Amino acid sequence: MHLGDLKHPNELHGLSLAELEDVARQIRERHLDVVSTSGGHLGPGLGVVELTIALYQTLDLDRDKVCWDVGHQAYPHKLLTGRFNSFDSLRQQRGVAGYLKRSESRFDHFGAGHASTSISAALGMALGRDNRGENFKCVAVIGDGALTGGMALEAINHAGHLPNTPLLVVLNDNDMSISPPVGALSSVLNRARLSPPMQFLSGSVEESVRHLPFMGGELPAELNRLKGSMRRLAVPKVGAVFEELGFTYMGPIDGHDIGEMTRTFQAAHRDGGPVLVHVVTKKGKGYPYAEADQVGYHAQSAFDLSTGKAIPSSKPKPPSYSKVFGQTLIKLCEQNSRVVGITAAMATGTGLDLLQKAVPNQYVDVGIAEQHAVTLAAGMACEGLRPVVAIYSTFLQRAYDQLIHDVGIQNLPVMFVLDRAGIVGADGPTHQGQYDISYLRAVPNFTVMAPKDEAELQQMMVTCLQHDGPTALRIPRGSGEGVLLMEEGWEALPIGRGELLREGNDLVIVAYGSMVAPAMETAALLEASGLSASVINARFLRPLDQALIHPLARRVPRVVTMEEGTLSGGFGAAVLESLNDHDINVPVLRIGIPDQLVDHATPQQSKEALGLTPNQMSLKIQQRFGLGSDDAAKSSPFQAVQA
């Protein structure tokens, strides 16, 4: 069978083992070919090829539901569910999404992008099924990393107390956490766990004893302990943990043996309650470079398949904001032993991997546990440390209560660096950093800022560490502006003070963070049209520099705000509220992300779609205020405004 001809995943049913192994080969080849060309997640999907095939051998995907945790390991799922021929468009504008989307396919049963959600979703589906009296299978596939997330453990705790609710959790243990493969012993233990005698000892014996007339329907404590002991003899220690939580545990099994997994999944489906099947896989399986460097090949830009090396950019780029942050933090940690960097399993993405190597005793990785990371930092701050929490903007959403309750209300000096703030590109709606401006505005006691370039980032880091209260700064994904950087000796910025970059008489542009450089380009375009614009680098969202903004707004009564974030409750809203509260009644044009999701595309394509390029913003400003061309003036709602 050629996968390009596969019309439905149920067509896998009945294929021989040799045919299924050929399907696995085709999936790997297609996966590698596409990701090496356009980039994407590599290692996770390569590791679950056989797992996906074996699982789908035992399911009817017209009825049964599968929730893939995070979703970056679901490329094989996509290749088996009607997207093999369109897979070349992976993570491209209007192409196949890099994560799961219910709107993309009826086989994407639950959308994902963040970790640790799958068990909760699958359990919810199972309860919905039972409520309607229906009969279909509900499955969650979760990695060992995502299982460290509190939400996953909460769901396991709940499901374990529902012994009559069938639910299958597949633990994809890719040898990065929990427990390594244990070879022949694990195979023996698994065969014993599935054998009829062990099923009798661990299950049927209880039912038999309960019906003895002198037992009164209850199992004596002594027999309960004996039953528990027999279970623990039959499974590894990690299995005993899940058994104690109310799950039937099966495994560990070889995650690249289709036959063994198929038999195990079939046995799991026959159970009438929650079951956890522990599958040991090799991340990057089938591509030696990815197997050897499982962290580096988790996700990749375009690369040469024959060498595994990234295809170099056509021209050199300045260092990324993440790298500048990481290198600067090393210096600050070396100068002050009380500074500690904290990450929630994203060291490489945030630049903290540099700190881990250079100053390991001032580095903490809490795993996928954003809530814990924030409150851990709060506790450290109580004891005189200066914690720096480096986290993606989209992931800090997961710890909003802790921001308010544990840091903000107590006014603790915790510094947050929000990486990937703004438009991130190909990862799509679940990863866009478009909400942090809005949600941080409301948190008590916080000082919130964003640099116009990487040099100002260094100054803001010093500002945060010297400030006796909670702080947050946002940095965009990708390269900096290429400005000259200082190795040390950075000076703190005055809190709440912006910067006037250029003066003009026709309008004032107030730009925040990554929009400062585009604002300057926009002002230059306006000047070419005969219009002069003042440009303010706001620097601070909270507190806003009213002393700079208000006089200019009174003198030049046309205000434009620019931000790379959602307009709802955003930076522009803060400026508008400030002007209104001080009776400065001038027209304000807010430019940013409207009330919509930003789908996967390149960052430039997304900005063009949102009207955030300098050319688009220049035209929008002229049209809004009736400045510049006659056509723009005729379409303006503010023709009567006097400069």
Curated annotation (Swiss-Prot):
Binds 1 Mg(2+) ion per subunit. Pathway: Metabolic intermediate biosynthesis; 1-deoxy-D-xylulose 5-phosphate biosynthesis; 1-deoxy-D-xylulose 5-phosphate from D-glyceraldehyde 3-phosphate and pyruvate: step 1/1. One of its GO terms (biological process) is thiamine biosynthetic process. Mg(2+) binds at residues 144, 174. InterPro entries: Dxylulose-5-P_synthase, THDP-binding, Transketo_C/PFOR_II, Transketolase-like_Pyr-bd, Transketolase_BS, Transketolase_C, Transketolase_CS. It holds the Pfam family Transketolase_C. Its cofactor is Mg(2+); thiamine diphosphate. Thiamine diphosphate binds at residues 72, 113-115, 145-146, 174, 287, 370. Signal peptide: none annotated. The keyword Flavoprotein does not apply. The keyword Transport does not apply. Keywords: Isoprene biosynthesis, Magnesium, Metal-binding, Thiamine biosynthesis, Thiamine pyrophosphate, Transferase. One of its GO terms (cellular component) is cytosol. It catalyses: D-glyceraldehyde 3-phosphate + pyruvate + H(+) = 1-deoxy-D-xylulose 5-phosphate + CO2. Its EC number is 2.2.1.7. SUPFAM superfamilies: Thiamin diphosphate-binding fold (THDP-binding), TK C-terminal domain-like. It comes from the Bacteria. GO terms for molecular function: 1-deoxy-D-xylulose-5-phosphate synthase activity; magnesium ion binding; thiamine pyrophosphate binding. HAMAP family: DXP_synth. Belongs to the transketolase family. DXPS subfamily. Catalyzes the acyloin condensation reaction between C atoms 2 and 3 of pyruvate and glyceraldehyde 3-phosphate to yield 1-deoxy-D-xylulose-5-phosphate (DXP). Homodimer. This is 1-deoxy-D-xylulose-5-phosphate synthase. It comes from Synechococcus sp. (strain CC9902).
